[in-house]
Amino acid sequence: MKNRYIASFEAAQIAEKQIPQFRSGDTVRIGVEIKEGEKKRIQTFEGIIIGRSGNGVDATFTIRKLGANSIGVERIFPLYSESLKSFEVIRRGRVRRAKLNFLRGLKGKAARIKELKR
């Protein structure tokens, strides 16, 4: 059980940040603040959510994208990080798994995910 002061601090952190609903299989575009020396810039990273883990302030999610020459790039982000500046869900994916680790072995058209129809 957490200390009540820590719990209230974490609740304030969560309430402060507005993050849209997303699941595994969704394609998202996030803006991450990068510090290079004294300069700051926002770098966008677009890919498929292959998993979420944790809960509360400690929650993280993993994004995978295919870069140049079909090389996969994965990044793990804390959900309530100060460096996340924007979060946009581009399309909803229709998947039946919580963790999409099988995508790591697939390339090209085999790595596509069907779009969820509403």
Curated annotation (Swiss-Prot):
For the keyword Oxidoreductase, the answer is no
Q: Record's GO cellular component, any one?
A: cytosolic large ribosomal subunit
From what superkingdom does this record's organism come? Bacteria
Biological process terms in GO annotation = translation
What protein family is recorded? Belongs to the bacterial ribosomal protein bL19 family.
| Protein's job | This protein is located at the 30S-50S ribosomal subunit interface and may play a role in the structure and function of the aminoacyl-tRNA binding site.
**What name has this protein been given in UniProt?**
Large ribosomal subunit protein bL19
What gene name does this entry carry?
rplS
